[in-house]
From Swiss-Prot:
Specifically catalyzes the AdoMet-dependent 2'-O-ribose methylation of cytidine at position 56 in tRNAs. Its EC number is 2.1.1.206. GO terms for biological process: tRNA nucleoside ribose methylation. Keywords: Cytoplasm, Methyltransferase, S-adenosyl-L-methionine, Transferase, tRNA processing. It is found in: Cytoplasm. InterPro entries: Alpha/beta_knot_MTases (IPR029028), tRNA_m1G_MTases_N (IPR029026), tRNA_mtfrase_aTrm56 (IPR002845). GO terms for molecular function: tRNA (cytidine(56)-2'-O)-methyltransferase activity. The lineage of its organism: Archaea, Methanobacteriati, Methanobacteriota, Methanomada group, Methanococci. It catalyses: cytidine(56) in tRNA + S-adenosyl-L-methionine = 2'-O-methylcytidine(56) in tRNA + S-adenosyl-L-homocysteine + H(+). This is tRNA (cytidine(56)-2'-O)-methyltransferase. It holds the Pfam family Trm56.
């Protein structure tokens, strides 16, 4: 299964930091691509710098029509929309994991920056809530991806990484490849 994240409604200066965090969280927790609906050179460059230093094969893409992208993806994939108005993650997560496992389909995860159009709810196979209180889309994304992968991606390492951190009880253990 390949995981892609579709970020709806990035709002330039206002969202560049949170959108960068969405991308970095996606990458760190197992996604292979993030798709934006708005061009933002700053976010793209930040993500590319992280991938260059920390490794992996994470892609950044901008699409003109999120609707077209989602409809095409849905032909051979499962679409999950994270929203505080969806079904309770504790009640539906097992079903989502089983659906992905038995169909061997890829996953598109939709998260919004602003008010999400009604059509996103209709296109999604699952509208999922991570709690029913206001919080960050980064938190919802991290919780969902961790539950989906059952924690298996938390300590991922990449062969092409120039920087690697080794968990330690008492010290900072960082390996930095010299150029």
């Amino acid at each position: 299964m390949t995981i892609e994240i579709l970020r709806l409604g990035h709002r330039g200066e206002r969202d560049k930091r949170i959108s960068t965090h969405v991308a970095l969280t996606s990458r760190a927790l197992g996604a292979k691509k993030i798709i934006f609906t708005e061009e933002d050179k700053h976010v793209k460059e930040s993500v590319e710098r992280i991938v260059d230093s920390w490794g992996g094969d994470f892609k950044f893409e901008v699409v003109k029509s999120w609707r077209t992208y989602t409809k095409r993806f849905k032909d051979n994939g499962i679409v999950v929309h994270l929203t505080m108005y969806g079904e309770n993650i504790n009640k539906i997560m097992t079903e989502i994991r089983e659906d992905i496992s038995k169909t061997n389909k890829n996953l598109l995860l939709i998260i919004g920056a602003e008010k999400v159009p009604r059509e996103a709810y209709d296109l999604a196979d699952y509208n999922l809530s991570v709690g029913n209180q206001p919080h960050s889309e980064v938190a919802a994304l991290a919780i969902f991806l961790d539950r989906l992968t059952e924690g298996k991606t938390l300590y991922s390492e990449y062969n092409d990484a120039k920087i690697k951190v080794t968990p330690s009880k008492s010290e900072k253990c960082v390996f930095v490849e010299k150029d």
